[in-house]
From Swiss-Prot:
GO CC terms of this entry: cytosol
Protein name from the UniProt record: Translation initiation factor IF-2
UniProt-annotated stretches for the region G2: 403-407
UniProt entry keywords in alphabetical sequence: Cytoplasm, GTP-binding, Initiation factor, Nucleotide-binding, Protein biosynthesis
Annotated source species: Leptospira interrogans serogroup Icterohaemorrhagiae serovar copenhageni (strain Fiocruz L1-130)
InterPro entries listed in its UniProt record: EF-G-like_DII (IPR053905), EFTu-like_2 (IPR004161), IF2_II (IPR044145), IF2_N (IPR006847), P-loop_NTPase (IPR027417), Small_GTP-bd (IPR005225), T_Tr_GTP-bd_dom (IPR000795), TF_IF2_bacterial-like (IPR000178)
Residue segments, region G5: 514-516
Compositional bias of kind Basic and acidic residues: 83-104, 250-262
Amino acid sequence: MEDKNKTIKETLQGSADAGKRKKLIIKKKGDDPSTPSPAASPKKETVAESAPSSKPPVMPLPLPGDSGQSPIVRPAPSSHSPAKREESPGKQDAGRPPRDKDTRQGGGSSYPPSRSPFQKEDSNIIVSRPIQRTGPSRPNSGGGYQGNRGPGQGGGGYQGNRGPGQGGGGYQGNRGPGQGGGGYQGNRGPGQGGGGYQGNRGPGQGGGGYQGNRGPRSGGTGTRPMPITSAEVELSQSRGSSVTSKKKGHDKEKSTSDRDFSGAENTKFFKQKFKKTKVVGVSGVSVPKEITLLENVQVGELAKKMNLKPGDVIGKLMKMGMMVTINNIIDAETAALLADEYGCKVKVVSLYEETIIEEEKDNQEDYINRPPVVTIMGHVDHGKTKLLDTIRRSSVIDTESGGITQHIGAYQVRTARGLITFLDTPGHEAFTSMRARGAKVTDIVVLVVAADDGVMPQTLEAISHAKAAEVPILVAINKIDLPAANPEKIMQELANHGLQSEEWGGETMYAKISARENIGIDKLLEMILLQAEVMDLKANPKRRAKGTIIEAKLDPGRGSVATVLIQNGTLRVGDPFVAGVFSGRVRAMYNDLGQLIQEAGPAFPAQVTGIDGVPDAGAPFDAMADEKEARNISQHRIEFERIGNAGAATGTSSKVTLENMNEFIKQGALKELKVIIKADVRGSAEAIKESLEKLSTPEVKLNVIQSGAGAIVDMDVMLASASNALIIGFHVRANPKTIALAEKEGVQIKYYNIIYQVVDEIKLAMEGLLEPEKIEEVIGTAEIREIFKVSKIGNIAGCMVLSGKIQKSANIRVIGDGVTKFEGKLKSLKRVKDDVNDVVAGFECGIQVDGYNDFKVGDTIEAYNVTVIKRKLE
């Protein structure tokens, strides 16, 4: 090392003797501290192998040892660029041991134009050849050979000269672990980071490799070098250079994707070159392969689900002939057509499927046997509620108006062999939706058929619901104590519908019972428990509750009350929950006897209070971990429901076809009866609405503008007044204040307790809106033979009655050349000179028509009567 230093010193002194350059002084740490330092210390910088740069190539830098190359000429120090500098410990690796002051100073030297100050013919300093030159030459400050440093020191080796404010350049040599970048860095512009070839470093060091030139303050790397040849590697190793030595774990060439593209230009290059390929739509973003939608969806929501801009969706819809905005609502069919253009499929789901609540994980060890849920179904008046009454030993049937079940009743009965939960569904034809819900939440269906009546429409409907829900059916043939009972006939009729009894080689269990006389009830219960045992019904009582809303109503004293069938888990007082589109916290719970309870387990029907609305019957019920989450889900469902209702309303009012265009061309042709329905429970209001809407005809439409549970209030009256509607109260009434307001506004309120009374009276009201049917009967015709002109009276037609008779009270029609010229009434009818009431065929008469004188010989006068017949709804 001393030989190297001596050789460099002699070279520099020889240059000074030539007198062509000022003396170049290279000082080490520890020299005169009074000398100011014009250049900052080189910053340590972690670098990585760079990518190809878009900059134009520059000439390669000559290697040390090459002959015939000119040195870099350094100007003399000026006032603003002193020749001497001191490397401050704070800037040049503080903590580095100071060097001994020696003779490492050289005077200015004059190199031949083809020589570089880095090169000497007998120099042992060898570096690999960089492929491209570094930045342009610039005025340099004092540099020099700094030598090697120990671990923790700054860059060592020959750094070369730097301009004011520049980072370290030149050859830095090797460093120990923890040191900054080493290797040949080359020259850099002012304010730049480390550049040039840095070589390899030990563990913990920054990245090595050839960094090349960078722009001012650029963090990016420069041009990429060509691979180092094996000859250069051998040459470097033979002369003691560690530039090409490999580090452990870094002997593989980095792939393009692993490189550090931190510079501005290279970052842009990376984004353009390595952008991932996606299935894209108009907006250049990925479109999912499948999305889920409700029956109606907002344009903005559709765009969000498809990862498209709203403008793209609106543009597509405009091409499809639909003028929409981001807030407009379209149906799922239209959305599916649009999505198909992007290769996206649409799956239509229900409101509750769109907002799925994440299932809680179950532990199979926690599952226990649960009671069966049994739904009693059948035709109206076949004895379903009486059967349940007998089982419960209570008088439930007496509380129902007209002896007909108005809504689902849920009860739990304790038998000798265990608990059974019963659901009693209505048998009236209006309660189709209730029976369908009952079949979906049940485990077993007991089909009650009267032995003296037979299979009826609601019996067949109940069979269809049970089969659709894949629920086993047990048949109870009731009223076998009556003289007209014929159980064999019932079994034959049911066998024709797929319910063949076990006695006849089938799989359906039959029980012959009499609910009134308590005959065969025990056998029926035994059959139910046997079927439940075969089904092996289980539930986990240790998880959060999950169930179904059986019924809901608005109670004056307790607010919204919902009957919930817990299907899994346990519901406790204080639990937050989501019930349909509403949320709440369990304030109180009651069993089917009205007693307060603290918790309800699987297959238990409980009445729950604390809901912020009246949910729909059949809606899902889910206990939640916290109330905030429950409210969020509720808000999403309410918004989706609003969109769905708005879309449905838009669809019904705008769909006009060629077939019905003539019916709607005149607004007066369509008559409408508007009603508001208020009932004690939500299910009854829903059933009444469904029944009344079936009464609509092309001429008279029934429009239920609002339906719900609860008492009739002032708001209902004001809505009815504004829309000219009738209010129907089912098991509810209005208070005196509301009644007075209704009288003032001229709103009619009708009260009912039995559903078929509602249907019958509304049907009569709608029939009154129908245009009566007019039947025309031609009673006689007469031909005009002569015309008599009377100045004071007008023209009189002399006619011969050809058929029938002409009556003075009849309507007449004047027909000429097959065209009706006039229709009206007779003003006078004379036989010779006498006024008569009618003239029969074969006689002549004189006819004067009120308001018509343009008679012509040969025209026909036709007399007819019109019979008005009141029409009925079909």
